[in-house]
Amino acid sequence: MFVSYRWLQEYVDIKDVTAQELADKITKSGIEVEGVEVLNKGVKGVVVGHVLECEKHPEADKLSKCLIDIGEEEPVQIICGAANIAKGLKVPVAKVGAVLPGNFKIKKAKLRGEASHGMVCALQELGIDGKLVSKEYADGIFIFPSDAEVGADALEILNLHDEVLELGLTPNRADCLNMLGVAYEVAAIYGREVKLPAIDLQETAEKTSDYISVSVEAKEENPLYIAKMVKNVKIGPSPMWMQTRLMAAGIRPISNVVDITNYILMEYGQPLHAFDYDKLGSKEIVVRLAKEGEKIETLDDQERTLQSHHLVITNGTKALAVAGVMGGADSEVTNETVNVLIESAYFAGQTVRRTSKDLGLRSESSARFEKGIDPTRTFEAIQHAAALMAKYAGGEALEGVVEADNLQVQERTVSVTAEKVNRVLGTNISASEMGTMFTNLKFPFTEVEGTFHVNVPARRPDITISEDLVEEVGRLYGYDHIPVTLPSGTMTRGKLTSAQTKRRKVRRFLEGAGLYEAITYSLTSADKAKQYMVEPNEKAPVGLALPMSEERSQLRLSLVPQLLEAVSYNVARKNDSVALYEVGSIFLPTEEGELPKEEQHLAGVMTGLALHHAWQGEKKVVDFFVVKGVLEGLFDVLGVANQITYAPAKREGMHPGRTADIVLDGEVIGFIGQLHPEAEKQLDVKNTFVFELSLVKVFGADAEETYYAAIPRFPSMTRDMAVVVTKETKAGEMKQVIAEAGGELLKDVTLFDLYEGEKMEEGKKSLAFSMTYFDAERTLTDEEVTEAHNRVLTTVEEKFGAELRK
């Protein structure tokens, strides 16, 4: 919010306070002032000049030779290149010796052989942002009204001696999104009165109700709608003082009627809209919800497609405006407009916010409706606008208004005790001082034995509970005046949640296993969003309404595609061995219009060498079993290893013979495998393995407790076994059968070799297991181990048809 220091003085007497002092005081009261801008930017020596003569430069077609009266004894000759310079105009002139922004000094000069004693200025050359200059003067010099005094200070007329405070408002302080709201705040800080705008409205005998009727079908979305007619307006520029105030507020002047609606917006915080009455197409206004797919061309010349929850202003059939967001081009006020219908309404903030978001269209009006406006100002604002249009546009304000009023403004009373205020703030403020503060805030109240019952004005929707009143007292008392004290009360130790602890375990283990953590974008393209999903999902991924690019337009449903991008990027730069993991969220679509369900996943990608420089050993290439071993170690750390199984699977984008689902207690929670050769070809990578699983489901499983035991006093015995089985036999399933058959003496089973080669029969493979036998109470005899081992051999022969390799 940009606040003009001079404009603010119309509502609060602060002439004894500098703009910088005011900024410091406002900041200390709880509203941050992000900066104070001096509008003149060091400019001096610019006056109003009257063009007495203007003729073409004899040596240059695009230059004009002008004789200009600048209020001195003799007029001066100035060469000007502006296309809109002409005899009789009053223009800003930088005299010789003047200083313009950037410390640019004006000197006597010769342009194509002709002397030039000064410079005729455009507003941009005086330091005004080009975005705030009206279209009429965007490409030329500025022209003052004909009654401007020759030789007068041009900066004074342009209000460039003003200073502007930029307020960094938090969402709860929407009451300060207008000049009156800021005035109430400043008046409370300094204990002064607020001078409300005087409305001098002269109405004709004709009635607004003779020209228009109003009905509201969507009463919940639009509880209050007021309309008023102003006839016979003459479209032209708004008065100079209004234009300069709007520019100081960051709004570009357009015309008197439009500027007046914007001026009221900045003064009251009440959005208004002006319709060209003669373009309405009927004598009725109907406020309703849009029809699905209904279209309207808005003031920014864009055709918008509406949805059934959008609120529109119609003429009974056709949409004229998107309520609270932007008007329609068909009923826009133009230079030919004669009769104006003014709209002042209270639209539900939630409706406006959703419409604005859907259409990707934000405006000054929508920003205020979203955060909440004061419904008690709706009538006053439209009356003031009509008075200004009558005065500055030559219009005739018709008697009365037409309205559809279903609004019930309930009085809010919030109570707080002086004891609570002092206890919370750590102060010793008397009840009478608190009463003075509430009076300065213009909060009516009654006090009964130290308890304040405060009637909260409608302009302050942020005051709802007693703590809000405590904050108000603290702000006005001054946070810098509150005594410094040490914290008191019971202190508790912070701790990590179970999920946080487990996530740290995951990161530590994977980094210890040689993987590097990556953090990738949560946004991806539409074609990648549904790749490599753990669970199939028929619903469309959640997309952004206004994506920066198609590559970042959808919320991801898997972590793998983004990790593969990172691997492909590295491999393309000769970094062939890459091992990455990511702990991040995926976003599962729910019902239409609802927020997606966010779920934590773990994913990893490995390619190239698993061991780069093994000491006195061979380099090891990443394969399925390397990646599976990493996951098995992770599950062991998390205490769920015995609950995890693997099942062969076929997944899109994955190698059909080297992919497995990760199953936890019968439920598929993830997958592991090698990329499909076609996918590897597209990414230009080789032998790349991936995995992804749901951490939510892993963390939710019952983890096995960790037990500690003394170091064994008795030796263990190891036996190896290599068996030939069919290729369909699952090593994991056989391992489980071996563990059960070995009984209590068999403490560990490890698969250490898998062989499928030329020496094997067709459809056969060799699995080699190492088995460790141990008893903590005694030394096992060879006969006991042989008995248990033979039992294992017999079992695998019977269950799997295994043959012992010799």
From Swiss-Prot:
Entry EC no(s): 6.1.1.20
Keywords on record: Aminoacyl-tRNA synthetase, ATP-binding, Cytoplasm, Ligase, Magnesium, Metal-binding, Nucleotide-binding, Protein biosynthesis, RNA-binding, tRNA-binding
Cofactor note: Binds 2 magnesium ions per tetramer.
Domain B5: 409-484
GO annotation terms (biological process): phenylalanyl-tRNA aminoacylation
FDX-ACB domain boundaries: 712-805
Localization, UniProt: Cytoplasm
Catalytic activity: tRNA(Phe) + L-phenylalanine + ATP = L-phenylalanyl-tRNA(Phe) + AMP + diphosphate + H(+)
GO MF, any single term: magnesium ion binding
UniProt xrefs under InterPro entries: aa-tRNA-synth_II/BPL/LPL, B3/B4_tRNA-bd, DNA-bd_dom_put_sf, Fdx_antiC-bd, Fdx_antiC-bd_sf, NA-bd_OB-fold, Phe-tRNA-ligase_IIc_bsu, Phe-tRNA-ligase_IIc_bsu_bact
Domain tRNA-binding: 40-155
GO CC terms in record: phenylalanine-tRNA ligase complex
Binding annotation for Mg(2+): 462, 468, 471-472
Listed cofactors: Mg(2+)
Assembly description: Tetramer of two alpha and two beta subunits.
PANTHER family, A to Z: PHENYLALANINE--TRNA LIGASE BETA SUBUNIT, PHENYLALANYL-TRNA SYNTHETASE BETA CHAIN AND LEUCINE-RICH REPEAT-CONTAINING PROTEIN 47
Family per similarity comment: Belongs to the phenylalanyl-tRNA synthetase beta subunit family. Type 1 subfamily.
Protein name (Swiss-Prot/TrEMBL): Phenylalanine--tRNA ligase beta subunit
